[in-house]
């Protein structure tokens, strides 16, 4: 995909990311509009985290920095996993106590007695969105400096030759991967927002907290 074509497509993705940022900001309202619990604060902070990831993702897509964009995608998947962890943990009070004391969430257990490791949360979250596993593994490969980095910098030449880009303008070959990264980020932001919406819609506690009080 040419850079010109990429620019045309990425502008639409960026517009969608900005819409999700507003949705994440609006999602804070029912959790923090008045008295709030640790449960509310945990979910509200997840919104803040997602907004900052969007703030980072947009310039990375604009500058065509696939390595950094993929790491931000991995972080967005992590935000979904940690949000979901609150709903599947065996002991909510212990979970929140551990989180707010900067403890290890992965040492706690879910309702089936299994530790809340990233691998376990990835598996559980795949029940909501089956694309999670593949996206997580791809993004993690770039986070942890694996062969995925070589793929991102390689340029196919003639007669089975391969060139490598060291510090120059990013290859056009990564443009399609960047677009996919943007689309997936939107997908997982929507997943995060859906989880929050289910909480708000299922609990009467939030009925009169959806609009900011004057």
Please tell me what each predicted stretch does.
Residues 1-67, 71-73, 78-86, 92-214:
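A cross-kingdom marker of C-terminal helix-rich interaction/assembly modules
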């Amino acid at each position: 995909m040419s850079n010109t074509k990429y620019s045309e497509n990425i502008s639409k993705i960026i517009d969608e990311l900005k819409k999700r940022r507003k949705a994440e900001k609006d999602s804070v309202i029912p959790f923090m509009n008045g008295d709030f619990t640790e449960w509310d604060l945990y979910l509200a902070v997840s919104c803040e985290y997602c907004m900052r990831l969007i703030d980072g993702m947009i310039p990375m897509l604009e500058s065509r920095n696939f390595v950094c964009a993929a790491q931000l995608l991995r972080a967005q998947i992590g935000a979904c996993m940690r949000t979901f962890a609150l709903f599947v943990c065996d002991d909510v009070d212990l979970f929140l106590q551990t989180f707010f004391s900067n403890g290890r969430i992965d040492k706690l257990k879910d309702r089936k007695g299994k530790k809340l490791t990233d691998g376990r949360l990835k598996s559980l979250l795949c029940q909501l969105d089956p694309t999670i596993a593949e996206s997580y593994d791809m993004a993690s490969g770039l986070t942890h400096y694996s062969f995925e980095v070589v793929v991102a910098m390689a340029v196919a030449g003639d007669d089975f030759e391969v060139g490598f880009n060291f510090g120059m303008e990013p290859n056009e070959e990564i443009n399609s991967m960047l677009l996919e990264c943007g689309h997936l980020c939107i997908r997982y932001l929507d997943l995060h927002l859906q989880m929050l919406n289910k909480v708000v819609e299922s609990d009467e506690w939030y009925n009169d907290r959806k609009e900011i009080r004057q």
